[in-house]
Curated annotation (Swiss-Prot):
The lineage of its organism: Bacteria, Pseudomonadati, Thermodesulfobacteriota, Desulfovibrionia, Desulfovibrionales. This is Translation initiation factor IF-2. Residues 569-572 are annotated as: G4. It comes from Lawsonia intracellularis (strain PHE/MN1-00). Residues 469-476 are annotated as: G1. Its main location: cytoplasm. Belongs to the TRAFAC class translation factor GTPase superfamily. Classic translation factor GTPase family. IF-2 subfamily. Residues 460-627 form the tr-type G domain. It is found in: Cytoplasm. Pfam families: EF-G_D2, GTP_EFTU, IF-2, IF2_N. InterPro entries: EF-G-like_DII (IPR053905), IF2_II (IPR044145), IF2_N (IPR006847), P-loop_NTPase (IPR027417), Small_GTP-bd (IPR005225), T_Tr_GTP-bd_dom (IPR000795), TF_IF2_bacterial-like (IPR000178), TIF_IF2 (IPR015760). PANTHER family: TR-TYPE G DOMAIN-CONTAINING PROTEIN, TRANSLATION INITIATION FACTOR IF-2-RELATED.
Length: 961
């Protein structure tokens, strides 16, 4: 099992992520992991790896506004790309406004904007050409692909090429507008990336990477500038007077490519600056131009470094922090987020620069807000069958003492390691506004039959008939008469103490009989037999009539909704009175057919075999009416009728198959145990290879002794069966711990007071089969009283072992063996450890002796017996002896060795003994009524006339339960 799991911390090292991120993903996937040392199943690894294998290509820059107009920039590592290097050439002074956009933002004051431009490895003059931007946000343009012909514009400080004229711009104006809109609509999602940035102090050199700008957008802008107002033309003239700067290669982008913030990534994957970036260290200067129009231009390029792009809050796209490192987000600098106010809209890419700049107020855009409203999710905690207080506090983000305080208010004494069941956890979580969600492995998905049975696949099966009734009414004898065997002769005391399952072939067909015990201690066995049966045959003795267990059997059959047939047995006895039996049956609701009812009643005699054939015919008729069918071609399902631990073969269980066919080698799950069928035996002890519906078989191959009555289900996968069994064992353990640890103040106080007074009888019980053990434990628990409490230290099926003796020795217990015997070595260990072993084969003898042992634990009861009294009529003071009371015995007698009380006006003045009792001068042992005597009391002389001396004695009696 160890190889099937992996620890959280080992998986985190393997995936290269932090344990905190891994635990977060596990919670999202609803995989139970409470700490870094928790184990994760190998089956869950693929979906965990799928969460971390998705490459994060959105490592971009994050923008924050520290002060009005001041931007915080941080860098994150970006994957290296195979894109071609960008060549920079000198630019002519006549170059008009460009729509170059960048992803790098620097920390700059709004009033003193000082952009920089990166320098290439070639020597570039330090002159700049001032460029104004009308765009609201930075446009992202990717590299062109070979499918689109590139038109390169290269300008030098002293010459300008004429191939980019106004005519070229006009020709490409219409097509470029369409292409830009199409490209923008295709890449709306990709442009809304999360930029990442690294903080750079104000005034320092800011290395920047300028993405290439498409030629068609530049031509559009040239056309706009020619049609603009005279104020714009004056600005262009002012631009030409300034020395030229350098511009990147401008080419037409591929229409199908997306505008990505990290399209032009020239940094290495390690995040180090390149030599080209390090060379950019030009001093900034401010813009001396006046801005006119209704709206001031939000973005401008100033100074000799064009790559330093200053964005006002209007131009900042949405910045999300979901993927950011917490340590990077919370810097020591004061930062203000403005992404909730200024939102980046991808549809602005479809609008011309004219509508984004000075004339933006003239055209209203119907842009939609890209951010979605945050949905309020209910706060939930995940609980399986139970949860510890510490784990619950961890999930709720509280301290454990807060939960303990709530539990104290609910009357529950709690500790930090106490397990809470799901009901208590729900109450506590509601106090803090949380909901409890029950999670865990759901076995119902694999065990519950989903598809209904097809009528063609159903075949007839033998009926399961359970014989029930009062003890000694002849149930097993009747079954022996049907089977022509002698089971009764082999039973201790002639009573049945196990459930017997037998397959019988009769003239009327095959019938499966279940013989249940009739003793009152085997109530659970009878209830279990009624649940798995088709017909109940109620056996009533003709001489005894309806008894207590007869009524109980009727109630079990009615609760299981099973038809009842009555067999009046012992008709051969001369004192048989069947009419009285029928009358008593009518009183409990079983009206015979002869009396106008619907209960089938037949008169039989197991001893003389009278009425047996008639009973079998009635059973066959009832079977035809019920139309019992089952599908033999599906995996087997059934119930455990009886289970035991065999010394040579291990755990063995009697299974009654209800549907399907059980084959040798099948994998099954039963209760908290799983296993594989190693061998199967029928009711006659013969080995069989398979068993169909309604067949009782003995199955060998359990991992442990299952509980009688558990469901037996075959599964196709052994691993699944083991997992279901482990899940059930964990749930059962959590339920037991939660039940034991749930102590209220009332139960705690009552328990402590009872423990001081009550005696405890510790027992270790071993039985031959699981069903008998269940009955014995239930009968012993009923014997507990307020004075003596029975404590079952251990109960199990199988032979008495040395470990049982050592356990009994450590806990001062008595070992009870029911139908089991110890070996010579075990007896020797018991003698050494002074452990008492008691053996029984009849359950009521066991119960009687345990009662006697319980009574022996009680201390004897002291009882006071009144003997008589004497009236004081004279007082004599004798030197050296004291006061002597001359008394007359008015009632009963006064004994010399008895105790006495001195009563004065009805008040007890003295209680003690008699020092001397004399009649005349002789010492006497007793004085009868009507005689006079002299009485002196021990150590007491204050006797007065008129006092009454009462005589009594104390008698000890054995305590009773």
């Amino acid at each position: 099992m160890i190889n099937d799991k992996i620890k959280v911390k080992d998986l985190a090292i393997e995936l290269g992520v932090s344990t905190k991120d891994l635990l977060r993903v596990l919670r999202e996937l609803e995989i139970s992991a409470k700490s870094t040392i928790s184990n994760i199943s190998i089956e869950d690894l693929p979906k965990i790896r799928a969460q971390f294998n998705t490459p994060n290509t959105n490592k971009e820059e994050e923008r924050r506004q520290i002060q009005p107009g001041v931007i915080l920039r941080r860098k994150r590592q970006q994957p290296s790309t195979n894109q071609t290097d960008i060549k920079l050439n000198p630019v002519d002074t006549n170059v008009s406004e460009s729509t170059i956009q960048t992803e790098n933002l620097i920390l700059e004051n709004k009033n003193t904007l000082s952009p920089h431009i990166e320098e290439t490895t070639e020597k570039i003059p330090a002159t700049t050409n001032e460029i104004l931007y009308n765009s609201q946000i930075a446009k992202i343009v990717q590299y062109p692909t070979p499918s689109v012909p590139n038109k390169t514009l290269t300008t030098t400080p002293h010459q300008t090429k004429k191939n980019h004229s106004e005519k070229d711009v006009l020709e490409s104006h219409d097509s470029s507008n369409k292409n830009i809109k199409q490209s923008s609509s295709q890449n709306t999602e990709k442009t809304n990336r999360k930029p990442a940035a690294s903080a750079i102090p104000e005034g320092s050199s800011a290395p920047s990477l300028l993405p290439p700008v498409s030629e068609q957008i530049r031509r559009l802008h040239d056309e706009e500038t020619e049609n603009s107002s005279s104020e714009e033309k004056n600005v262009d003239i002012q631009q030409k007077e300034i020395p030229s700067t350098q511009v990147r290669v401008i080419s037409k982008p591929n229409i199908t490519q997306s505008h990505s913030w990290d399209a032009n990534n020239t940094r290495s994957s390690s995040g180090q600056r390149t030599e080209t970036e390090k060379q950019s260290n030009t001093a900034p200067h401010t813009d001396s131009r006046e801005h006119t129009g209704h709206n001031k231009r939000p973005v401008s390029y100033q100074g000799q470094n064009r790559n330093n792009f200053i964005a006002t809050p209007d131009t900042i796209p949405n910045v999300e922090h979901d993927g950011q490192n917490k340590k990077k987000r919370h810097t020591s600098r004061r930062s203000t987020e403005f992404n909730h106010k200024f939102q980046y809209n991808n549809e602005d890419d479809d609008i011309s620069r004219q509508n984004r700049g000075r004339k933006r107020h003239k055209q209203k855009t119907t842009s939609q807000v890209t951010t979605q409203p945050i949905k309020l999710t209910k706060r939930k905690i995940r609980v399986e069958e139970a949860i510890r207080v510490a784990d619950m506090a961890h999930q709720m983000g509280l301290k454990a003492n807060e939960i303990i305080k709530v539990l104290f208010n609910l009357g529950v004494m709690a500790t930090i390691n106490m397990s809470l069941d799901i009901d208590t956890a729900t109450l506590v979580a509601a106090e803090f506004g949380y909901e409890v969600e029950k999670i865990g492995f759901t076995e119902e998905d694999y065990l519950v039959a989903t598809a209904p049975e097809q009528s063609e696949s159903l075949k007839r099966r033998p009926p399961v008939v359970t014989i029930m009734g009062h003890v000694d009414h002849g149930k097993t004898s009747l079954l022996d008469a049907i089977r022509k065997t002698n089971v009764t002769g082999g039973e201790a005391g002639g009573i049945t103490q196990h459930i017997g399952a037998y397959h019988v072939t009769t003239k009327s067909g095959e019938i499966v009989f279940l013989d249940t015990p009739g003793h009152e201690a085997f109530t659970t066995m009878r209830a279990r037999g009624a649940q798995v049966t088709d017909i109940v045959v109620l056996v009533v003795a003709a001489d005894d009539g309806v008894m207590e267990q007869t009524r109980e059997a009727v109630n079990h059959a009615r609760a299981a909704n099973v038809p009842i047939m009555v067999a009046v047995n012992k008709m051969d006895k001369p004192e048989a009175n069947p009419d009285r039996v029928l009358r008593e049956l009518s009183d409990i609701g079983l009206v015979p057919e002869d009396w106008g009812g619907d209960t089938i009643v037949t008169k039989v005699s197991a001893k003389s075999l009278d009425g047996i054939d008639e009973l079998l015919e009635l059973l066959a008729l009832q079977t035809d009416i019920l139309e019992l069918k089952a599908n033999p071609d599906k995996p087997a399902r059934g119930h455990i009728v009886e289970a035991k631990l065999d010394k040579g073969r291990g755990p063995i269980a009697t299974v009654l198959i209800q549907e399907g066919t059980l084959h040798q080698g099948d994998t099954f799950v039963c209760g908290v145990f799983s296993g594989r069928v190693r061998a199967m035996f029928n009711d006659q002890g013969k080995k069989v290879k398979d068993a169909g519906p309604s067949m009782p078989i003995e199955v060998q191959g359990f991992e442990g002794v299952p509980e009688a009555g558990e469901a037996f289900i075959c599964l196709p996968d052994e691993k699944l069966a083991r997992r279901i069994a482990e899940s059930r064992a964990i749930k059962q353990r959590e339920k037991e711990l939660a039940k034991e640890s749930r102590v209220t103040l009332e139960t705690f106080l009552s328990k402590t007071s009872n423990e001081k007074e009550a005696q405890v009888l510790n027992l270790v019980v071993k039985s031959d089969v699981q069903g008998s053990l269940e009955a014995i434990l239930e009968a012993l628990r009923k014997l507990s009283t307020a004075k003596v409490r029975i404590n079952i230290i251990h109960g199990g099926s199988g032979a008495i072992t040395e470990s049982d003796i050592l356990l009994a020795s450590a806990s001062d217990a008595i070992v009870i063996g029911f139908n089991v015997r110890p070996t010579a070595k075990v007896k020797e260990v018991a003698e050494q450890e002074n452990v008492d072993i008691r053996f029984y084969d009849i359950i009521y003898k066991l119960v009687e002796e345990i009662k006697s042992a319980m009574a022996g634990l009680l201390a004897p009861i002291s009882r006071e017996v009144y003997l008589g009294q004497a009236d004081v009529r004279e007082i004599f003071n004798v030197p050296k002896i004291g006061t002597i009371a001359g008394s007359h015995v008015s009632d009963g007698k006064v004994l010399r060795n008895a105790g006495v009380r001195l009563l004065r006006e009805g008040v007890v003045v003295y209680t003690g003994g008699i020092a001397s009792l004399r009649r005349f001068k002789e010492d006497v042992r007793e004085v009868q009524k009507g005689y006079e005597c002299g009485i002196s009391l021990e150590n007491f002389n204050d006797i007065k006339l008129g006092d009454v001396i009462e005589s009594f004695e104390t008698v000890e009696e054995a305590a009773s339960l």
